[in-house]
Amino acid sequence: MATEEFIIRIPPYHYIHVLDQNSNVSHVEVGPKTYIRQDNERVLFAPMRMVTVPPRHYCTVANPVSRDAQGLVLFDVTGQVRLRHADLEIRLAQDPFPLYPGEVLEKDITPLQVVLPNTALHLKALLDFEDKDGDKVVAGDEWLLEGPGTYIPRKEVEVVEIIQATIIRQNQALRLRARKECWDRDGKERVTGEEWLVTTVGAYLPAVFEEVLDLVDAVILTEKTALHLRARRNFRDFRGVSRRTGEEWLVTVQDTEAHVPDVHEEVLGVVPITTLGPHNYCVILDPVGPDGKNQLGQKRVVKGEKSFFLQPGEQLEQGIQDVYVLSEQQGLLLRALQPLEDGEDEEKVSHQAGDRWLIRGPLEYVPSAKVEVVEERQAIPLDENEGIYVQDVKTGKVRAVIGSTYMLTQDEVLWEKELPPGVEELLNKGQDPLADRGEKDTAKSLQPLAPRNKTRVVSYRVPHNAAVQVYDYREKRARVVFGPELVSLGPEEQFTVLSLSAGRPKRPHARRALCLLLGPDFFTDVITIETADHARLQLQLAYNWHFQVNDRKDPQETAKLFSVPDFVGDACKAIASRVRGAVASVTFDDFHKNSARIIRAAVFGFETSEAKDPDGMALPRPRDQAVFPQNGLVVSSVDVQSVEPVDQRTRDALQRSVQLAIEITTNSQEAAAKHEAQRLEQEARGRLERQKILDQSEAEKARKELLELEALSMAVESTGTAKAEAESRAEAARIEGEGSVLQAKLKAQALAIETEAELQRVQKVRELELVYARAQLELGVSKAQQLAEVEVKKFKQMTEAIGPSTIRDLAVAGPEMQVKLLQSLGLKSTLITDGSTPINLFNTAFGLLGMGPEGQPLGRRVASGPSPGEGISPQSAQAPQAPGDNHVVPVLR
């Protein structure tokens, strides 16, 4: 910043730039100095400290001044310093120096860079120059300055980077790459892009044209691991084996304990050892042959005990597999993949490709590479009532094997028998046809149904007194099985499903069943009928039924049972039709009176008997059962459970008539019962009187015993009660006492705390009041003393001012004036008093008579003159009283 002062004092080691405005040339003035500025000069800035470069430091000056051989600054013809424009000058430690006009301190004072051991500076030449040894350096040359040492910077040299040495430890290698043609530190020539490894343990400082790619760790090999490698190019490995591009091989612990992958080796992974136990084997695909190449498409079976590494290109077909150890109930189904001979020398059997055969245990079997294990078979244990469906794959024939343990042969497979969905559902429900027939289907449908094994023989347990029909579609014949029995279906057999009516009234196809119950049983139906007088009624009838089978061994007889699929609906419809026809011909009153007989006759019908009426006609006799010849169903009885009119008016009329009949019957029964009761009462009364006397005697005895027991019981009870009450009261008293003591103690503590607090409060209040009262009294006493002193002083000063004679005159002036006033009035005596002074009037009479109190005339006393106490009240010398307070009583002669 320019300064306008004329005298500039320049301290030591300071400088200024002075501009000559006439010649427009600047020069430097260095202190210590007092510079007097001329009018044509201008100081460009205040004195500035010189640039001081301490030891082991440097700075960079741009546009430096030119110097001669002796180091003196050169000037041009105008007196301006000569500058090397666009040039740099690095100045090391020296005496403080000023900056000439035009010089710029481009880089401030900077410590010299110290190159530590195991480090180097990567230097690059920016300009051509000769070093201190006289060697020519061309622009673009690169070299390293290795430590330890101090780097002296040059303007022609650029520091590219600082290179650190890489520490190579045991089982490590340094991977390098040449950036251009060079010689490595071992004296080998390297071409651009070439890579190599340095395995020497220690610190390695890469050369200038060497690029560090990474630090490669050695792979530690054990007995259980191997290293899988692949060649990137043709080279010779550490064992001296020539490798071709793409070739793969393994390195195991037998080759080396720790392997550092070469730059031409690609690590594909670590291969674990494959260990086979005594009961293991494996199948190797594409095994390596004696020539070291993979035999594509070939297989090799290896059986344990053995440990090996899978060579490159080899793989296990299904991993490590267990040897097939077969027991007596196990077998293996095998298939030949290639022609082979199986068995020992004498029992060799030739198999063609695709042949299937079964081997049975007990034995250990390892399949060869030419054999495929189709499946492992187990003998299927079967009870007497269990079975399986077996199909011959060659003939296609299906048969059922029941009752013995069976193992499938090589030509047999398990066959699945399909059942209709309805039959499948009925079998999976597991309901008892007899015990669970009244339960709802939804009660068990919520439970998940276990899937049926379709290869097992379908069996069904026929309950007692029931029948199941099985139809063979191949033989086209049916068979009926009566329970209790277990029926098993053949491969071509199916159950006959019954679709029965159910509900009230009956609904068709409401229930399905596999077995037919033979009864006896009952079913209930609700039907609507109409009488001859058009009264509509609703009947609920229950029928007892059973099936009548004369010969269960006769196929035609047993087939009749299943001839009607819905025997319930068919029977209910037939019986309802008969009942409607019979009721339609009678009136409501007749049906109401004879409903059971009419319905029974309609259901069972009549049969002709030999009995005749008086007219000689045969009398019909009602039957006791109804038989349905189609299926042998027999209805043995009918129960009329309810009869309800459908019409509301008919229902009300019927209800009234029923109530009236009930009342009549009730009244007659009541009268008969009352008469019988009176008779029985008379008889019982006599017995009662006799019994009463006997009972009284017994009662007295019992009362005596009762009183004794009561007394004893009361004594025991009172003792126990008293004891319990005493204990409870004592316990209650103890608890109450403890509570009272604790409460009193707490109250006493609280009262003591309150009393102590109140006492302290009152004490402090009294102390403060006492201090206050004492202060007030002291103030009052002081005030009274001061007032008294003031009054005394005032009175003294007044008396001194007035004088004794004046005071006497003032005291006497009043009474004398009053006396003179009274004398002027002619009054002989006066009395002046107030209300508080008593007046003695006993001598008033003497005054009225003109006599004194002693009986002397007043004239004498007046003539002699009044005494000082007469005629004037003692209060006359006092101050004048207020009007009305004193009474003047004149005394007249």
From Swiss-Prot:
Residues 856-893 are annotated as: Disordered. The modification Phosphoserine is found at residue 445. The keyword Nucleus applies. Pfam families: MVP_shoulder, Vault, Vault_2, Vault_3, Vault_4. Coiled coil: none annotated. Phosphorylated on Tyr residues after EGF stimulation. Dephosphorylated by PTPN11. There is a cross-link at residues 444, 704 (Glycyl lysine isopeptide (Lys-Gly) (interchain with G-Cter in SUMO2)). One of its GO terms (cellular component) is nucleus. It comes from the Eukaryota. The modification N-acetylalanine is found at residue 2. Keywords: Acetylation, Cytoplasm, Isopeptide bond, Nucleus, Phosphoprotein, Repeat, Ribonucleoprotein, Ubl conjugation. MVP repeats lie at residues 2-56, 57-111, 112-164, 165-217, 218-272, 273-323, 324-379, 380-457, 458-520. CDD domains: MVP_shoulder (cd08825). The vault ribonucleoprotein particle is a huge (400 A x 670 A) cage structure of 12.9 MDa. It consists of a dimer of half-vaults, with each half-vault comprising 39 identical major vault protein (MVP) chains, PARP4 and one or more vault RNAs (vRNAs). Interacts with TEP1. Interacts with PTEN and activated MAPK1. The phosphorylated protein interacts with the SH2 domains of PTPN11 and SRC. Interacts with APEX1. May interact with ZNF540. MVP 3 mediates interaction with PTEN. MVP 4 mediates interaction with PARP4. This is Major vault protein. It comes from Pongo abelii. The gene is MVP.
